[in-house]
Design a protein with these regions (language model features):
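Short gly/ser/thr-rich secondary-structure transition/capping motifs
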Residues: 10-16, 137-140, 202-204
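Short, well-ordered secondary-structure micro-motifs
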Residues: 44, 88-89, 116-118, 141-143, ...
Length: 242
């Protein structure tokens, strides 16, 4: 049976891809993906045939991968981070209903919440909620409700897609909601370009975060009541006795 692999390639660096992801890509004939992600792979897998689409062409990209697999090519659909967390795995299964002759295998990768947490120190040390601020596929009213629920329950909150040209005020809006439930001095963190050239990180308070500008390459972390700064790193204790 023909097969297409849906591969999470991690946050960016080749060294942070899983061994299974690398070995699977090595045996593939065709690699399909968003243009930015494909450019990250070409250096390490130069002999592959690459097919790309731009942003907002996700369904077409999936069908492209299935068409190649249906022809007999060993095919991979690549996603940044993990294929199942804001990735293409779900859409691949949905569109895969049109291609019953093609099997699907998902290869996990390290999502930004984990890669960014490590850069910050130990930001995600306890229960965590992952929320995307992009309203391209989810209405803002629902995003706002999820933010309120997560803040009220005192989760560590990791915000994906915190800003873009059209959503430059969304992080500030999210922080306003957080401040209804969390203290102004709640420890927060920002990591930009996780595991890529130009990686930066900073810790700051929730009050400061509300006034901070970030971009689409940033991942934002908002701590819980126990989160603190140790050695200039953001640390959320698990609760062990010391």
């Amino acid at each position: 049976m023909n097969k297409v692999y849906v591969i999470g390639m991690g946050p960016g660096a080749y060294e942070q891809m899983t061994v299974k992801a690398v070995r699977t890509l090595e045996k593939c004939d065709v690699i399909v993906g968003y243009t930015v992600y494909i450019e990250l792979l070409k250096e390490y897998f130069p002999d592959k045939r690459y097919l790309t689409t731009s942003m907002r062409q996700e369904a077409a990209r999936c069908r492209m991968a299935f068409e190649e697999a249906a022809k007999g090519a060993v095919t991979a659909m690549v996603c940044s981070g993990d294929a199942g967390i804001y990735g293409m795995a779900g859409l691949m299964y949905e569109i895969g209903e049109e291609y019953p002759e093609v099997a699907i295998e998902v290869i996990p990768g390290m999502t930004a919440a984990l890669g960014g947490s490590a850069v910050l120190g130990a930001a995600v040390g306890h229960d965590v909620s992952l929320i995307s601020l992009s309203d391209l596929l989810t209405p803002w009213e629902l995003i706002e409700e999820r933010l309120r629920c997560a803040a009220k329950a005192d989760f560590v909150i990791c915000l994906y897609n915190p800003s873009s040209r059209k959503r430059s005020t969304y992080l500030a809006k999210a922080c306003e909601i957080m401040l209804e439930y969390k203290a102004e001095d709640t420890v927060c963190g920002i990591v930009k370009n996780i595991a890529r050239e130009g990686e930066t990180m900073q810790t700051l308070t929730l009050k400061e975060l509300k006034e901070t500008t970030v971009d689409m390459f940033s991942t934002v972390f908002i701590g819980n009541k126990q989160t603190k700064v140790i050695r200039e790193k953001m640390v959320t204790p698990r609760g062990y006795r010391i």
